[in-house]
């Protein structure tokens, strides 16, 4: 009991702390465009910048557009909710202005806590609300199968959102969960891998219970919402909330998915490696979470009606006594379809293990709901207090650290739920374990530590969700007690086996039992008359088959055969190869742990059958009693009792200590379970790193193997090349040896030919370069021509546009002139009309005056007429009176009338009154006159009337004309104004057009100036290029001429070489004969030496004898020289045969000079032309011919015929015998093909003798084209140069004895490119050569160009056609002598490309040389 009391207190404290963690509703009502709050009400724009107090509010800047979806009603009508891009939140109404209204009729509904979630920028993972889902499914099962589709279709239509929604939401949640699991690895904190598992729970708990500063006014509402107060609502209210939360949830889920994408982008930026490392595992686990997250969001329906703080709160919180919430939960249970849809979408990454566990657990909990058992909450509370909350506190602390470090990603919308927070935590813990089970499938070697805790905690927590909700199930759903116990036992056992044995273990049969038992239970319960059971079957029975069969299919391949027997079998086709080994290890380990902890699960099964309702009543009754006692004890001094809740303090302390140690134990176990998984992240990282390194290593090895193969191939090729090169070298050496044996001089000639060939190649390469330059220049010229054409076309276009503008200008000018003319005409017409109007005004005024006068005259005439009428009347009256008088007087009528008339006339006239009779007559006469005058007056009156009528008509006409003129004037004025406006417009247009024209003209002028400058630059470049082209063409022509000359010279040298070869063959024969003679002489000398030695010994003996006895031997002295000996005369005065055989004539001094073979007199060695017989008979300075020199017995044979190499010859000829000079007359016959020069100039093919070249007889058929081409060029000067020179004796005289030839350099350097065909070497007086010691050993600088006639060599790269004269023209040596080439140093003074100009020496003294 002490333990129970301690648990009661701790449970109460925890429930109170959870009560205080509720969120605040900003308003109770809201207005939306539709029931789901997904319709866009209006679009607004921000009038000012706004920053909200927390993350529930939307931050924006001025001018941004916001889409409004929700408007709060009631107290906070000033707040609207909308989205800006991917951000969603509340903002004040006065900060925005409406731009466009989409929905005018708004729907008012109640708000939920999920509308005011605040995520604070951290990743929020929607966990699976298994506790309430499983606990309440018992109420939400439809009893009839025919209602199943109808009811489920309602919710399917609510949740079948666009396909892109689940794709984004699924990927977002997958990737959001991965970094949540991986966050500690990247944070780098000391508890790196410890936090790895704990961050998930913390992020879930932190999101569900955000740390919001709740004012006291919101505490009660928070308590209501957390404890589910007001659970006993009427069915109408529940049905109202059926549709609203569903639609709200779809909208909120869409918003949360958008928020998750923002967090995902941050995640991808911050933790790309860890996300990649655990992507597959996190996606496997994220599917059930995604399902429950969508479901849990719609479950958070606020219940504003409350029935008391403790009673309703704890009944809703703890899950008993609330029997009217079944209809409310229809809306909450409408989200399980969402649990299936993401499953079906993310099928390729989802494992069967968690699905199976969830399904079996759900079936078991449904069955347990239908069982009216009495499980005790002791073990449940013990588990919460010992494991979940201790671990939660620890995780909360760690997560706060992670939040401070910014390492953990959380979403910005924590879901508030009316479920129990402890249940949520336990569900989260279950999800953590599932996640760990799925993520940690690969590394299994170190998971033995968690084998004790994971099965225990899993089974304990899976079955723990039910006892809180046992009382929610109506009594008619309860099954018979024995059947229920059996089913639950089977389900628990089978659940464990299905949970921990997945693969080929013997537990496959038990896994089949899991499905069979769970489905049998679910089918059994589905027949009970509850409204949502079929709903659960619609979405949970297919979730085991459809999610795994049709969509997910991710589980182990070996599970298939065991599940084929069932129609709802789980297939796995996508991740077979990936998960077989890991699932085998996991199932084996879990199977062992299951066997070890079987007894614990039996105890747990018993503990879960204890009545929670009675125990909770017993738990809360002491609390009530305690409050009553405290109230009663307050007036008495507030002394504590001797016991606590009716228990002794000893028991209470013991229970507290035991509970404390139990908490520590479970914390320790949880810590060990967490620590047991620390290696997972590291191992995955290391595995990824290792795999990457292995891949890199394999790539590097492949590259290395390829490079090694290439290197080996290259080595093989190089070895082959080296072998071939060695072979060629050996062959060349052998050939050289043979050639040396045969004739060393041929190799020298071939070397000279090679030099010439190289020079020819260089010339040809230069020629090709020049051709390339020409081609480039032509291309450039072409491109420049194209550019010039394009520029010309552009200029033409510009000119055309300019002309068009000019034409337009002329047209505009003409139009302006026409408009001005029209304007002037209109002005003139206006003036005329104004003048006419003035004239008409004057006429009208005159007519008005006339009218006035006529009216006055008319009035006067009318007065006169009136007067006359009155007078006539009076006259008639008087006449009548007169008639009356006549009747009275009795007189005649006529007399009376006459009398009357007369009287009247008299009375009128006042003349005849005194005579009455005459007056009567006069009166009558006067009356007749009056009648006549009256008639005339009447005629005048009629005329006046006619005139007046005419005047009236004219007046009317004039008035009409005036009116017409006025209208015409008005119209003309309007036209005038119109024309004036048009004139102004035209003037404005003219100004604008002139400005535009000027601007265009300026632009065109600028363009033209730029183009002109560009054209000038191009022309300058073209001129420069033309000059370069002209220079290049000139150089090309010179090169061609020189190439032709070289070809001709080459041909001539070839012909000369052929003649020299013949002569050398003859020389070789002569040298052989001389060698034989020398050998005979040598033998003679040896014999003579032997004889002399013998004589010497004899004389020494005689001398000794004579010393002993002077008179002992008296022998006559014979001739010591033995001239008459059989061996012939002694040649002691001559050089030894070795030296004598290779001594060269004095012309050897001229050897290093090696003048051109084209020199007169055989080119220094003889005539170049082999067909000239006179060249073979050239005499030396003593007049000896070459034929005579062949028979000279005292002269050593020529070195050119010797079989020894030339450097041997030179070395042996360096020191002649003492007192012995080179006899000029004893030179061997001269072959006219050998020549040599030390001048450094190109003086014939003899310059190339130091290079190895095949003999000329071999080259006849395979001669290079360069040599063949140069052969023709060398033929030109043969006729002029093969003439014997008369200056040879003097020149040869200058080359007298006393000169010692220098040692020969083994390799000749690059030759100074000089054309040797020029005749300038034949001119000039003979002069003595320099001293012998420095002539051949010195470099070419020894003879500076200024010391000798001829221009100095100029260092430019072009070869001249004529040879330069940078060195003295040494005279040709005596015929038959072929000196060795000089040192390479003397040859390499100038590069081969530098040619001193020698145009002057070519024509300086040719005739005197020929004459001499």
Swiss-Prot record:
Principal subcellular localization: endoplasmic reticulum
Membrane topology of this protein: Single-pass membrane protein
Keywords on record: Coiled coil, Endoplasmic reticulum, Glycoprotein, Membrane, SH3 domain, Signal, Transmembrane, Transmembrane helix
Effect in UniProt of substituting residue 697 to A: Loss of interaction with PERB. Unable to recruit PERB to the endoplasmic reticulum exit sites. Loss of function in collagen VII transport. No effect on interaction with MIA3
Residue positions with a glycan: 59, 368
Cytoplasmic side: 668-1412
Transmembrane segments: 647-667
One Pfam family recorded for the sequence: SH3_2
Intramembrane segments: 606-626
Entry-linked Gene3D superfamilies: SH3 Domains
Domain comment, as recorded: The proline-rich domain (PRD) contains repeated PPP motifs. A single PPP motif is necessary and sufficient to mediate interaction with the COPII coat subunits SEC23A and SEC23B. The coiled coil domains mediate interaction with MIA3. The first coiled coil domain mediates interaction with PREB.
Its job: Plays a role in the transport of cargos that are too large to fit into COPII-coated vesicles and require specific mechanisms to be incorporated into membrane-bound carriers and exported from the endoplasmic reticulum. Plays a role in the secretion of lipoproteins, pre-chylomicrons and pre-VLDLs, by participating in their export from the endoplasmic reticulum. Thereby, may play a role in cholesterol and triglyceride homeostasis. Required for collagen VII (COL7A1) secretion by loading COL7A1 into transport carriers and recruiting PREB/SEC12 at the endoplasmic reticulum exit sites.
Protein name: Melanoma inhibitory activity protein 2
